[in-house]
A protein has these predicted regions:
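Active-site loop segments of alpha/beta catalytic cores
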Residues: 1-159
Length: 159
């Protein structure tokens, strides 16, 4: 995909959070480290998303050569950064079920996440997991517009 013009690489490890930290450390982490080491020459951002319920695994990821670590909605942006020793950018972490709520509720949740994210450099807004099939494309479009407008406003306030 990168050769065809992809702008980033993301490894989704959606259910690794089901493992204990020890099993993750023994059976999965060496493979993740090898994958990202072998991709180190790629000239695009490399993202690792350890999936749902993976907050306890975050301290194990501080030496993975990913540029960004994705967070699910169960760990705040601030706590995720702390567990990663502020060594890497983070991405996330809107609960995808919020997309079933009215637009103003979606925007409240998105604003709270953005407010945490922009406290330090190295943040990408995203969902904390994948979309559900019933997700409304209109709500996603409105959310995207809100993210752009709100983020720009907040960044301008900081300067």
């Amino acid at each position: 995909h990168i050769a065809a013009g992809g702008k980033a690489f993301q490894l989704f490890d959606s259910w690794v959070g089901a493992l204990s930290p020890n099993d993750f450390r023994v059976f999965v982490l060496p493979v993740i480290e090898r994958i990202f080491h072998e991709l180190s020459d790629l000239q695009v951002p490399k993202i690792y998303f350890p999936g749902v319920a993976s907050g306890e695994l975050l301290p194990e990821l501080t030496n993975v050569k990913a540029d960004v670590i994705g967070l699910d909605w169960r760990v705040s942006i601030a706590e995720g950064r702390r567990r990663l020793n502020n060594k890497v950018a983070v991405q996330g972490n809107l609960d995808p079920t919020i997309l079933q709520a009215p637009q103003h509720i979606i925007e409240q949740h998105a604003a709270a996440i953005i407010d945490q994210g922009i406290e330090q450099p190295g943040y990408i807004f995203n969902l904390g997991h994948g979309l559900y099939p019933e997700a409304s494309l209109d709500k996603l479009k409105s959310l995207t517009e809100f993210i752009h407008t709100y983020s720009e406003k907040k960044l301008l306030q900081r300067t």
